[in-house]
């Protein structure tokens, strides 16, 4: 189980202080003014993160749509919030929000892969912060199965559920032409080869 460590301070830490003081050698997030340092993730989490990151990044590169970052890129959303999403996408029209130390503003698309210790924040404080900041699309994916998995798109300033189609495929609303077959995610952790999945997506478009 992935565990969380909270770095307690007398006063809430600001995003500027977080970018200055956060450790460079491990993942850390600023949630409501508190620096949270998770323990190393489980293998099941990393396998899913690796598959989705490579698939999305390769698609975005082929289509020249923007840039994709992994779980060590901090995002300054608000004064007291600077999460490090598992996967994020910034469209080519908004690359100016990418700074030397991280992202300054809302990414277009965020994916969080749930764990027992992070799900509460992913569905709670971070969900609300992403929504307030204007993240246009938010996927919360449970590596153990579809039951806890949720997909959202921003409509009139609020996250609304975004459902897969009748065939079990989910199309992104921010990365045009990108979609996933949900069966790829829960097939005994035997993910299809990334190149094979990418070609399936490209051939369908």
PLM segments and residue spans:
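Gly/Pro/Ser/Thr-rich low-complexity, intrinsically disordered segments predominantly at protein N-termini
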Residues: 1-205
């Amino acid at each position: 189980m992935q565990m969380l460590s909270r770095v307690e301070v007398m006063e809430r830490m600001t995003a500027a202080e977080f970018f200055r003081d956060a450790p460079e050698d491990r993942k850390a997030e600023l949630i409501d003014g508190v620096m949270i340092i998770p323990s190393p993730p489980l293998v099941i989490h990393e396998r899913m993160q690796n598959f989705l990151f490579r698939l999305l990044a390769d698609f975005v590169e082929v289509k020249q749509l923007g840039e994709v970052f992994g779980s060590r890129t901090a995002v300054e959303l608000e004064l007291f919030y600077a999460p490090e999403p598992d996967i994020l996408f910034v469209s080519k029209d908004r690359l100016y929000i990418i700074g030397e130390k991280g992202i300054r503003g809302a990414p277009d698309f965020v994916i969080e892969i749930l764990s027992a210790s992070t799900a509460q924040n992913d569905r709670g404080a971070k969900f609300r912060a992403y929504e307030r900041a204007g993240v246009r699309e938010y996927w919360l994916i449970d590596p153990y199965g579809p039951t806890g998995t949720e997909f959202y798109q921003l409509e009139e300033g609020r996250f609304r559920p975004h459902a897969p189609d009748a065939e079990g495929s989910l199309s992104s609303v921010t990365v045009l032409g990108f979609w996933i077959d949900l069966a790829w995610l829960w097939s005994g952790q035997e993910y299809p080869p990334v190149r094979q999945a990418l070609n399936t997506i490209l051939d369908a478009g």
